[in-house]
């Protein structure tokens, strides 16, 4: 997987986790800083490059904004993200 693909995937995981927290009422999810640190830790465990927090915040915020603008029903997004992010959420 290219560095750009890793970057996009990592930012997408962070954005979708934040979406669950703020839009799907997942109050059990930790602070954004913990989500970011965990995402970088998991990336390093996979042998990926760690991203700077600044880069990850900017890119994940852009993706989060696009997710909030997406016309897919919120319940569908919440269900999909809960299912797809189960392993990552268990790392938090």
Model-inferred region functions:
Residues 1-49:
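Short N-proximal segments of mature Sec-exported proteins
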Residues 28-92:
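Compact alpha-helical subdomains of small soluble proteins
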